[in-house]
Amino acid sequence: RLVGSEMCIRDSFMYESYINKIEDVGKLRNLKPGTIRTYQNNVKDFLKFINKHPDELTCEDARDFLLFLKNKGNKSSTLNNKNGALVFFYKRVLGKLWDDNLVPRAINDYAIPRVLTRSEIEMLLDATSNLKYKAIFALMYSSGLRISEVIHLRYEDISRTNMQIYIHESKTHTARYAILSQRALDILTEYWFKCGRPTGILFPNQWTGDYLTSSGPRLELKKAVNRAGLPKDIHSHCLRHSFATHLLEDGVDIRYIQSLLGHRSPKSTEIYLHISNKTLIGIHSPFDKKGGDKNG
């Protein structure tokens, strides 16, 4: 009979095999590596907390774990991330039933997103000395792109004829088209001619030629924010928030904004309704509108 440290070693090996299964199943379901790692880390925390053989797990165990985290002060968004990992583990890896009534998702306590004024957008871009990152930030704002989407763009994804951008590396695994701003295209064209005329990866790492990681643009954005004297809480996703909010200010219907942002659920887009909605008058990137700052 195993006791003490021997039992811990046995349990560690047992858990490791299940953690590896998360990776295998995740790859088969075409999950992104970052999502798989998040699931693995969350499930590891859960298994350490419950200390039971995975085959013996129940929904009550998951509920106890999430309640424990809730009582520790974790936010609803964190609880829902843990919930999503456990749902995947139970249903896809263990083949167990999941009871949404017993283990419901937390009601999100959404905060109003940080939105830059149009003047602040101009200040940020003016303070970005590196032309590659200036083009990246211009695309993120003018087209509402996530940082992961813009760094995975390829030359052929940019349609100058239709003034559209094809997004194939989206968070929701759903391809979509985003609008292409003329001003952003002008900046992008300048970058392209002055920075090696890349024909594959649009923003390659200058040393490896591979895709950039998100850390580079985030660091450059922080530097530009400091140089421009802008509030220090501005981060990369604020550019996407600003795109959506400025479109709402310009009267674009929220259903079209949902499509442009690639949101599966309208609830994800409704967070921008703190600004009054108007009638659809035609979709043009807010980046092509200079002056007349309506947001401060």
Question: How would you name each of these model-derived features?
Answer:
Residues 2-9:
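Short, small-residue-biased leader/transition segments that mark boundaries at the very start
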Residues 10-296:
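Conserved catalytic core of the tyrosine transesterase superfamily
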